[in-house]
Amino acid sequence: MRTYTPKPGDINRQWHVIDATDVVLGRLASQTAILLRGKHKATFAPHMDMGDFVIIINAEKVALTGAKLEQKRAYRHSGYPGGLTSVNYAELLESNPVRAVEKAIKGMLPKNSLAAQQLGKLKVYRGAEHPHAAQQPKTFEISQVAQ
């Protein structure tokens, strides 16, 4: 029996909406990365972009466990010598929660050329409103929430 390789026309993309209220950031990122890659589908192929579109709402209400708000730091570099800046997650979630969620999800995607395509299917919004109602997204529940 020959191995099935999906054709680009065989890919059926769904839209999922995830409410990030009180969901632990790592669990949210892990489940979202699985949906973006398409690993939940029976026709998954690691060399193709098989994933679905994911909308995350209420990014400002995401939870971090333990002392990560004060101890975990997000780094970025300007490209110039001495251009490394860092900020702790308490400040990052207050100023730009969308960036915090995108950074966590990007770290869980493969480090190859498909990652940019897969990240392009991710839409993160700070509040509860999103402009993708025409796509009729299905609600995706993440079972574990913060205590």
From Swiss-Prot:
Transmembrane segments: none annotated. Keywords: Ribonucleoprotein, Ribosomal protein. InterPro entries: Ribosomal_uL13, Ribosomal_uL13_bac-type, Ribosomal_uL13_sf. GO terms for molecular function: mRNA binding; structural constituent of ribosome. It comes from the Bacteria. CDD domains: Ribosomal_L13. GO terms for biological process: negative regulation of translation; translation. Pfam families: Ribosomal_L13 (PF00572). GO terms for cellular component: cytosolic large ribosomal subunit. NCBIfam families: rplM_bact (TIGR01066). Belongs to the universal ribosomal protein uL13 family. HAMAP family: Ribosomal_uL13. This protein is one of the early assembly proteins of the 50S ribosomal subunit, although it is not seen to bind rRNA by itself. It is important during the early stages of 50S assembly. Part of the 50S ribosomal subunit. This is Large ribosomal subunit protein uL13. The lineage of its organism: Bacteria, Bacillati, Actinomycetota, Actinomycetes, Micrococcales.
